[in-house]
Amino acid sequence: MTATPREFDIVLYGATGFVGKLTAEYLARAGGDARIALAGRSTQRVLAVREALGESAQTWPILTADASLPSTLQAMAARAQVVVTTVGPYTRYGLPLVAACAAAGTDYADLTGEPMFMRNSIDLYHKQAADTGARIVHACGFDSVPSDLSVYALYHAAREDGAGELTDTNCVVRSFKGGFSGGTIASMLEVLSTASNDPDARRQLSDPYMLSPDRGAEPELGPQPDLPSRRGRRLAPELAGVWTAGFIMAPTNTRIVRRSNALLDWAYGRRFRYSETMSVGSTVLAPVVSVVGGGVGNAMFGLASRYIRLLPRGLVKRVVPKPGTGPSAAARERGYYRIETYTTTTTGARYLARMAQDGDPGYKATSVLLGECGLALALDRDKLSDMRGVLTPAAAMGDALLERLPAAGVSLQTTRLAS
């Protein structure tokens, strides 16, 4: 909660990047009367972005801010109700802006999928942000809004029915079309590089509760692997015949969901277990893909987290998409995702949440989700939680997002299943 009115409802920082431009385009369409400004290192490049946005954005002010110059971030944060940032990898560039927003009592939303960055943000700035009234909300894109909000919706459905707390909860990516942005790949490489160079970070990354506000208070529920391969019928009867394998974003998404549960005072339940997998179909080859794919994925992740530092950085950069690059508009329009999340409660009741969105998940869908998170923080303040500090999307604005996202083309429906 800011002490005095701010000049801007939202400042979009990183507007010249690929996803930054898409987010600016979305805000120009959906921002309504919100007072929006664009920010970046180069005034000329930001001006060029604004000129391409159409008439509604031509009066948006331009701010100059640079991650290497903390004073510019502080000045930007002091003028904004909310700062929305697409400038990553966040491990490398993110903490100075978190610091500026925490000090100024300014709400913040980003796209990070980097657990160690989030852990550092929590350790360094959670208390200060709570004291100043800032909401620092990480993972506001495809990772991890669909995962986080689906479970939050299931919790609401079970609570309204008086059906008890959530126990085994499994998210399955049923279908997915699209790629991962250059920025997302850069973030993944940053995670692996951090783990490779720092044994303590590698140990923390292996902890399913590494983002918990109180690690000692978390229940011991046995192994919770990040990249499991499972038969669908083990997850839910409705998935009989389907095989699943590990989902690449699960190591981040699962930790966000578990942090949400803890921030909400374990409202989902003390026996809440959460996993994510991706459907590989029901063909005769599906079991092979599930088992081999899962084994290879776990092996590659384990090796990369230890030895990626030995690869020449120039070689790595040549073989992965560059940050700021992405597919054509037509390709982005062809993308989509469909996820299903199944849960069983302590009373034996079963529920399903289906979430779907059109648009490439790493680009178009992410820009919509980030834009809506920024708008919720700025405009729906009476619907936000009372919590302050370093939060998750569900803990900070779960109710506001459940109300806001359908109008943005995001479908999320919960159903009670036969027990």
UniProtKB/Swiss-Prot annotation:
There is a cross-link at residue 127 (Isoglutamyl lysine isopeptide (Lys-Gln) (interchain with Q-Cter in protein Pup)). One of its GO terms (molecular function) is oxidoreductase activity. The chain crosses the membrane at residues 284-304. It is an enzyme of class 1 (oxidoreductase). Its main location: membrane. It is a single-pass membrane protein. One of its GO terms (cellular component) is plasma membrane. Residues 197-232 are annotated as: Disordered. Its EC number is 1.3.1.-. The keyword Magnesium does not apply. Keywords: Cell membrane, Isopeptide bond, Membrane, Oxidoreductase, Transmembrane, Transmembrane helix, Ubl conjugation. It is found in: Cell membrane. One of its GO terms (biological process) is glycolipid biosynthetic process. Coiled coil: none annotated. Belongs to the saccharopine dehydrogenase family. Enoyl reductase subfamily. This is Putative trans-acting enoyl reductase Rv2449c.
